[in-house]
């Protein structure tokens, strides 16, 4: 572990020198790239230097203890040494987790897609509830949300809806929402008071830079059409909605706001995210075939969470976490669940680094 930490510290110092080089300072792309790399290493280096400093102080105190016979000084030095030594295990634990390879997509903005699945109108209403939950959570994290495309249901909620979430670390926070979400409750339209089970699927797609995925113009078919709302009524009076089809894969993205130019930009952004996601899914399936992770495979059909309204209970099936806080969670208070899933993923990665042992 310490060999790796020495390499990290050496790279950090190298980046310090590079960032004072006029050639790099005047190149915005390089400056952004190396500044981000340095920022990513900052915490690891800070903790490692704190660790080394405390170890050096302990060694110095040991030397002083060997040289003095003064009882008061010995007592004082022993107390100081004990205090320093008590901090070492926690710092070592921090360093283990800081060395875990980061997901390269963690800092990216995302496109979230929610689709009503089994359960008819109730599933569509639940999709709307999930949209509200994620919007509230995004607001609490100072993330910006924007609707990209929505197909409303006649009885409330959405057949499907996609929206962007922008902010540092958006993907790292929302990536665990991938999968099938199940709700158990009595629908408002149910006169007999029977509990119904409905599901909605959630897909979280990291947004991509042009350099990460190449799309040729000749591979795109772009159509404009008149947008329709719930029940088929026309929302716009002009053909401003845009549908883009990627011909080699058949992947389609649409956007139906008022501006055709904005719709084209939004649809293209979603298309890129979906194509990149296809690539990620292929890689994850290969990985999952070798080893299923503690937080699930990321498969969109995998049941990840159940929201039980009669018992005010939310259960995340991947880590066996149950919370009696349904009202709070539906108001966007997802931190406890997301933190637990993040810790589970980190622990699993740490086990892999240590050949199955913690």
Swiss-Prot record:
Highest taxon, organism lineage: Bacteria
Gene transcribed to yield this protein: prfA
Main location: cytoplasm
Location within or outside the cell: Cytoplasm
Phylogenetic classification of the source organism: Bacteria, Bacillati, Bacillota, Bacilli, Bacillales
Name by which UniProt lists this protein: Peptide chain release factor 1
Sequence similarity: Belongs to the prokaryotic/mitochondrial release factor family.
Post-translational modification summary for this protein: Methylated by PrmC. Methylation increases the termination efficiency of RF1.
SMART domains referenced in this protein's UniProt entry, alphabetically: PCRF
């Amino acid at each position: 572990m310490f060999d790796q930490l020495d390499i990290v510290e050496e790279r950090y110092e190298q980046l310090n020198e590079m960032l004072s080089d006029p050639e790099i300072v005047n190149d915005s792309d390089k400056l952004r790239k190396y500044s981000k790399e340095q920022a990513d290493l900052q915490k690891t280096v800070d903790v490692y230097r704190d660790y080394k400093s405390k170890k050096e102080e302990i060694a110095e105190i040991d030397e002083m203890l060997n040289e003095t016979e003064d009882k008061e000084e010995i007592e004082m030095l022993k107390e100081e040494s004990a205090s320093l030594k008590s901090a070492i295990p926690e710092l070592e634990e921090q360093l283990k987790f800081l060395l875990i390879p980061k997901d390269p997509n963690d800092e990216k903005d995302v496109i979230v897609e929610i689709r009503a699945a089994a359960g008819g109108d109730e599933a569509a209403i639940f999709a709307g509830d999930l949209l509200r939950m994620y919007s509230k959570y995004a607001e609490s994290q100072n993330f910006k949300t924007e609707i990209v495309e929505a197909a409303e249901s006649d009885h409330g909620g959405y057949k499907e809806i996609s929206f962007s979430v922008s902010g540092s670390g958006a993907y790292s926070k929302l990536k665990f929402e991938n999968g099938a979400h199940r709700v158990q409750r009595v629908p408002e339209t149910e006169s007999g008071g029977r509990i119904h089970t409905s599901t909605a699927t959630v897909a979280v797609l990291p947004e991509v830079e042009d350099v990460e995925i190449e799309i040729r113009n000749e591979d795109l078919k772009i159509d404009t059409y008149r947008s329709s709302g719930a029940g088929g009524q026309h929302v716009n009076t002009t053909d401003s909605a845009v549908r883009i089809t990627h011909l080699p894969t058949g992947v389609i993205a649409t956007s139906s706001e008022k501006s055709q130019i904005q719709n084209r930009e939004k649809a293209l952004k979603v298309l890129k995210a979906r194509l990149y996601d296809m690539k990620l899914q292929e890689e994850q399936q290969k990985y999952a075939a070798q080893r299923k992770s503690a937080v699930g495979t990321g498969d969109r059909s995998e049941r990840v969470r159940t929201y039980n309204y009669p018992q005010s209970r939310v259960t995340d099936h991947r880590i066996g976490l149950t919370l009696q806080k349904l009202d709070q969670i539906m108001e966007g208070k997802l931190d406890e669940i997301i933190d637990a899933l993040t810790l589970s993923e980190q622990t699993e990665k740490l086990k892999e680094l240590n050949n199955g042992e913690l």
